[in-house]
Amino acid sequence: MSKLRTEDMSHPVKPLRSFLIQDILSHMGPGSKEKSLGFPKTDQDQDSSLRDTEEKYASEKLQSSSQPAEIHHSHMEADENLELDTAQPITAVENKLAKQQQKRSRAAFSHSQVIELERKFSSQKYLSAPERAQLAKSLKLTETQVKIWFQNRRYKTKRKQLATDMEEVEKSSAHPAQCRDTNISRTSLLSFYQNYQRYPYLYYLAGWPAPLW
């Protein structure tokens, strides 16, 4: 009897384990309930799994189809940025030209200033830097205004001289033709007079038509 007690005390007593379903499920994860119990999958579970698979496939397909659109959109943004970058220098050039045009606006000279400038130009077509500075100071103008006025005046003089030369060339080219026509008329008249023996007197020439002269 004592021997049995000694053997019982030598083996530790194992705690009792409950075989109730609630106790069993409490020691297991929510995902392994059906697997541990060996319950077969229902139609609802199969439909849910199939639906999840379809949704995953549709999501992957949507992502793959949206990538070209995103790439195209990024290319469009890059092109727009490039256009903006290339348009900026043009705008800068236009602004620069507008400022230059404003600076080149024609200055208004007074009557006395114009008279003095014309008097100086008639005696001297080109001015040195000291002469230009002295003239600008005497007329209360800037050296740039005096320089531009002389440049425009020289251009105007050359253009006027060129027009005069062209008129002279046209006149000189027209005179030989007129002389040649006159010589032809005189030659024709003399030939007609020599061949037409019935009217030998010169006084009859007054009765001929004017174009023959």
From Swiss-Prot:
An annotated GO cellular component: nucleus
One example of a Gene Ontology biological process annotation: regulation of transcription by RNA polymerase II
Positions with biased composition (Basic and acidic residues): 32-59
Keywords: Developmental protein, DNA-binding, Homeobox, Nucleus
Induction trigger: By ihh/bhh.
GO molecular function: DNA binding; DNA-binding transcription factor activity, RNA polymerase II-specific; RNA polymerase II cis-regulatory region sequence-specific DNA binding
Pfam families assigned: Homeodomain (PF00046)
Chain residue ranges for the region called Disordered: 24-72
Superkingdom to which the source organism belongs: Eukaryota
Main location: nucleus
DNA-binding in keyword set: yes
Miscellaneous note of the record: Based on similarity to Drosophila 'bagpipe/bap', the name 'koza' was chosen after a Polish musical instrument related to the Scottish bagpipe.
Function as written in the Swiss-Prot or TrEMBL entry: May regulate cell proliferation in a tissue-specific manner.
Annotated family: Belongs to the NK-3 homeobox family.
Name the record gives this protein: Homeobox protein koza
Organism the protein comes from: Xenopus laevis (African clawed frog)
